[in-house]
Amino acid sequence: MAPSSKSERNSGAGSAGGGPGGTGGKRAVGRRREHVLKQLERVKISGQLSPRLFRKLPPRVCVSLKNIVDEDFLYAGHIFLGFSKCGRYVLSYTSSSGDDDFSFYIYHLYWWEFNVHSKLKLVRQVRLFQDEEIYSDLYLTVCEWPSDASKVIVFGFNTRSANGMLMNMMMMSDENHRDIYISTVAVPPRGRCAACQDASRAHPGDPSAQCLRHGFMLHTKYQVVYPFPTFQPAFQLKKDQVVLLNTSYSLVACAVSVHSAGDSSFCQILYDHTALPPAPPSSPGPWSPEAAPAFPSLGVEVVPAQPSGAPEPSPAIAKAKEFVADIFRRAKEAKGSPLEETRLPSSLGPSSSRCRPSLEPQAPSGEVVPRDSPPAAETTAPEPGYINYTKLHYVLQSGEGTEPEDEFEDDKISLPFVVTDLRGRNLRPMRERTDMQGQYLTVEQLTLDFEYVINEVIRHDATWGHQFCSFSDYDIVILEVCPETNQVLINIGLLLLAFPAPTEEGQLRPKTYHTSLKVAWDLNTGIFETVSVGDLTEVKGQTSGSVWSSYRKSCVDMVMKWLVPESSGRYVNRMTNEALHKGCSLKVLADSERYTWIVL
């Protein structure tokens, strides 16, 4: 190939002469070739193709936004976010508010059908965060699940950074609280299904007349406190149809699905009681060494489960072993054994025990469900005290004012949802699927109580449990989610008060310590298991902010060190307006899978 610049010609000449310039030329050419080869080799290892190899795209798939969108829409304040995973749509949003400080922000999301050689065609417009009083501009993130293309989820984050005291007075809040707004919206269908055609005939001329499967909207709002939970869409949406929400006090797994009346294929997504461990002794428990590869990438110490060949002990035996194990542990500590040596054999109980309902102090001893019990007994197993499960079906009612509001007012644990269709009509919640006609939307919520879990782990599994006084604050980070086994691995950072170790003479007052607890939560059974318990690290002169900053950095380092890349199609697509809040704009909207750019 002929050199395209003077420097390359000189490099080539040096190469021909074999002098010093030639050596440098060979190095330069070799370095460029080696770079490409290394990149292609990395594709084999990671399964992902770096977009840096193809920054210069052919002009036929590189179009200007001004050429495909009418100026009226640009003047109306449309902020374009990016391509959908399928490449069929480009998404944008608008925000509007009044001129005074007491006006609310109103957000709308838009789907535009994209064709390279024609202008964008608007196919859907919806209002986000139904009827919420939003007083400041939000950080927006629009996400798509790895394989579920039927809906998108929109997160709105309020950072409390605007108008200071006026904002606090109006919202009766302070800088220690932040509002989280969420809307889940059905994606426009490629073609009109039979139910959509029926809706169009019932409401001629109304573009929002869609069936529930292709035209639902679900909204909720909750408030988080300091230390504000990290936003982890890659983990929170890793399981299709499910979103994990950290509310600061609990981890809520929400599953959203649409079904038709009389559909025999209805399948419960969360908290399926029939997924309890089977009876054969050769089948290990969920966290026995044989089952440990559920999280192969994290390399953490898994507290061993009971041997697979051993029978399940009765509740009385479990409590007796727990008592003996506590005595054994205290004796080991009195002899000055290292902390890592005080973890007990699996046969002795607390370190290897699953947190079953039978181990709760207020639970009767007969609540444990034996592994060899019949299926009927498994389906009637009581809920562990640290979880709450609800399932509501939302249906569209023709009559107004018939919703039984009082039936659902007493539930203070589950997140409140408002479900509407595209025409703005509210859907009525029902607990049973009886007497349903047409389509209905099902919302499942499985809630894990953080403080309950913390107390249980310290009580059963912490070697320093006898030193523990109380915890003052905690922070939760999701380390991994396995969509095949429905296991969620979380890290709980703790600030706590505890008495010093017995070896420290004269120390009678408790000190402040930091530690972390790793816990695996099963979305099928609701049961959690202790993976590992960290040692106590004394907090000396550090602020809580510096403690949480170091803790989160350690979590990021752990996740990145053991990260196993997903296949190119198994990623969470994420679009955000972060650039707008930084005072700049995106340069391009890129569809990396189809090598298409829209230049802004």
From Swiss-Prot:
InterPro entries: DCAF15, DCAF15_C, DCAF15_WD40
Compositionally skewed regions (Gly residues) per UniProt: 14-27
Sorted UniProt keywords: Immunity, Metal-binding, Phosphoprotein, Ubl conjugation pathway, Zinc
One cellular component (GO) term of this entry: Cul4-RING E3 ubiquitin ligase complex
Modified residues (Phosphoserine): 50, 314
Region (Disordered), start-end ranges: 1-29, 334-384
Biased composition (Low complexity): 344-359, 374-384
Residues that coordinate or bind Zn(2+): 193, 196, 211, 214
This protein's record includes keyword Phosphoprotein: yes
Amino acid composition bias (Basic and acidic residues), ranges on this chain: 334-343
Molecular-function GO terms, alphabetical: metal ion binding
UniProt name for this protein: DDB1- and CUL4-associated factor 15
Originating organism: Mus musculus (Mouse)
Record lineage: Eukaryota, Metazoa, Chordata, Craniata, Vertebrata
Gene: Dcaf15
